């Protein structure tokens, strides 16, 4: 019996880069096949070929034994294939129902029957166990909720082959469990699934088989993961042993650099108070909706502050805009790097030099292009940013390499005092995480106060000197590194009445 999906010797070349070279593996009906590899290894490129966005330069894609050519996304969908990419694809000013049924809204005599559409979507969402308002506009939803809409859109197409690229990167624990149930149901229903994730727990929980990519090549395939240690997968992905991914080392801390007292904003009603010392890394943990990102955006001047006070090195701090924050040496690496972190149409060099261009002026009039080129080349080499050259458009880089470029932007800033990192390793592979943690520690050694928001509890525990836990828009507690463990943190993060054991 033919495999539901087969990749046969797939190759793809971009200018200066061989993105895929000889990729061959099968996905059976009723199987979840994991794909793992560092950012830039070629996983997402393969899915774009499957989804009709790219055409392979060699090899073929077979669906149910038939060689297929997908000149467009519509052709892929018509063949029973659904691909959910990391970069969410939605219309922000349309409702959940309209996004889910885009192109197939029920109509009568040319008029859309919105009531029928909303009822249909509500019924299907309820059947999937997904709690979303069918009438809510996408722009008003959180990133996690938008991700669920994308997943539901693929499921509504009743596709036989479904590919998921980092589907849980923005989901809460509850939403992740809903997704896992959906994947299990689809497997039992005989669908063939490809599942890309950097999270080992998810690969071992969901996947029947797994293929490892490195530098565009297929370096290993496992028909079963039952007897494959995690260390083996990591070594195959990165080509080396990583004994301590966090490489934490105690540091001498300075005086209090950033202090917040009874800080309030539109989504922060209780008043948040905390300190961060020079050279200290303070991790902020909480469930989705706890208010962590909102607090950081208030500090950075991206959201309105309605109460409380901030001080920087003991001096009152009045930040009314992000420009004020940057001028005072406070920067933010945002959660949504695609929308807020990078300038997608600009080059890698331009993205690295954006913040420090005021230091690169010559005679007050002209940009020092030579100095900018040298700065970009230095950080591309230092942070191992995978790019053909500094002139490459940053949108063509993997998520991990985009994040490195954002961090390089602030490493190049000479007057940096406070660095706020909101989900700095979301959707990034284990090798790139290791390198980014090194950058974070380098910033701390320079005396920067580091505030790191993360939904990955092992990351918070592994990197932070101190952990602040938020719950329902307020600070629920604080733990020193020596007293912090998963149970203690979760007991502070969970709603009152729940416990870590119950979770």
Curated annotation (Swiss-Prot):
Its EC number is 7.5.2.12. The lineage of its organism: Bacteria, Pseudomonadati, Pseudomonadota, Betaproteobacteria, Burkholderiales. The complex is composed of two ATP-binding proteins (AraG), two transmembrane proteins (AraH) and a solute-binding protein (AraF). It is found in: Cell inner membrane. InterPro entries: AAA+_ATPase, ABC_carbohydrate_import_ATPase, ABC_transporter-like_ATP-bd, ABC_transporter-like_CS, P-loop_NTPase. Keywords: ATP-binding, Cell inner membrane, Cell membrane, Membrane, Nucleotide-binding, Repeat, Sugar transport, Translocase, Transport. This is Arabinose import ATP-binding protein AraG. Part of the ABC transporter complex AraFGH involved in arabinose import. Responsible for energy coupling to the transport system. It comes from the Bacteria. Its main location: membrane. One of its GO terms (molecular function) is ATP hydrolysis activity. PROSITE patterns: ABC_TRANSPORTER_1 (PS00211), ABC_TRANSPORTER_2 (PS50893), ARAG (PS51268). PANTHER family: ARABINOSE IMPORT ATP-BINDING PROTEIN ARAG, CARBOHYDRATE TRANSPORT ATP-BINDING PROTEIN MG119-RELATED. Transmembrane segments: none annotated. It comes from Burkholderia pseudomallei (strain 1710b). ATP binds at residues 37-44. GO terms for cellular component: plasma membrane.
């Amino acid at each position: 019996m033919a495999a539901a999906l087969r990749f046969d010797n797939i190759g793809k070349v971009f200018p200066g880069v061989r993105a895929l070279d000889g990729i061959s593996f099968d996905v059976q009906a009723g199987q979840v096949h994991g794909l793992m590899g560092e950012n830039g290894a070629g996983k997402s490129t393969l899915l774009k070929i499957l989804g009709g966005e790219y055409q392979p330069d060699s090899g073929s894609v077979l669906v149910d034994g038939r060689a297929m050519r997908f000149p467009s996304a519509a052709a892929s969908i018509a063949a029973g294939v659904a691909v959910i990419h990391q970069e969410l694809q939605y219309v922000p000013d349309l409702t959940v129902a309209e996004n889910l049924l885009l192109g197939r809204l029920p109509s009568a005599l040319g008029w859309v029957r919105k009531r029928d559409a909303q009822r249909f979507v509500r019924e299907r969402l309820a059947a999937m166990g997904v709690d979303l308002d069918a009438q809510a506009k996408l722009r008003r939803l959180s990133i996690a909720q938008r991700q669920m809409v994308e997943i539901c859109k693929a499921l509504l197409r009743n596709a036989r082959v479904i590919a998921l690229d980092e589907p849980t990167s923005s989901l809460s624990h509850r939403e992740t469990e809903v997704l896992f149930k959906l994947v299990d149901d689809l497997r039992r229903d005989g669908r063939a699934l490809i599942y890309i994730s950097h999270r080992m727990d998810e690969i071992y929980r969901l996947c029947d088989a797994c293929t490892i990519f490195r530098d565009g090549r297929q370096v290993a395939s496992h028909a079963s993961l039952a007897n494959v240690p995690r260390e083996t997968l990591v070594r195959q992905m990165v080509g080396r042993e990583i004994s301590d991914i966090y490489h934490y080392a105690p540091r001498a801390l300075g005086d209090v650099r950033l202090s917040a007292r009874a800080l309030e904003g539109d989504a922060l009603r209780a008043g948040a108070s905390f300190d961060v010392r020079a050279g200290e890394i303070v991790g902020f943990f909480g469930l989705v909706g706890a208010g962590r990102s909102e607090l950081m955006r208030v500090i950075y001047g991206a959201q309105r502050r309605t109460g409380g006070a901030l001080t920087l090195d003991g001096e009152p701090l009045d930040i009314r805009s992000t420009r004020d924050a940057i001028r005072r040496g406070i920067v933010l690496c945002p959660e949504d790097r695609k929308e807020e972190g990078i300038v997608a149409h600009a080059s890698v060099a331009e993205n690295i030099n954006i913040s420090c261009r005021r230091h690169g002026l010559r005679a007050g009039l002209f940009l020092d292009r030579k100095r900018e080129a040298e700065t970009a080349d230095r950080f591309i080499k230092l942070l191992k940013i995978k790019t053909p050259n500094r002139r490459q458009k940053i949108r063509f880089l993997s998520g991990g390499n985009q994040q490195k470029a954002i961090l390089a932007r602030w490493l190049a800033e000479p007057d940096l005092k406070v660095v706020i990192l909101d989900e700095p390793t979301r959707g990034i592979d284990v090798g790139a995480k290791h390198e980014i943690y090194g950058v974070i520690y380098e910033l701390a050694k320079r005396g920067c106060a580091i505030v790191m928001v993360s939904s990955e509890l092992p990351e918070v525990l592994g990197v932070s000197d101190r952990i602040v836990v938020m719950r329902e828009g307020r600070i629920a507690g604080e733990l020193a590194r020596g007293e912090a463990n998963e149970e203690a943190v979760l007991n502070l993060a969970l709603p009152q009445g729940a416990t870590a054991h119950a979770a």
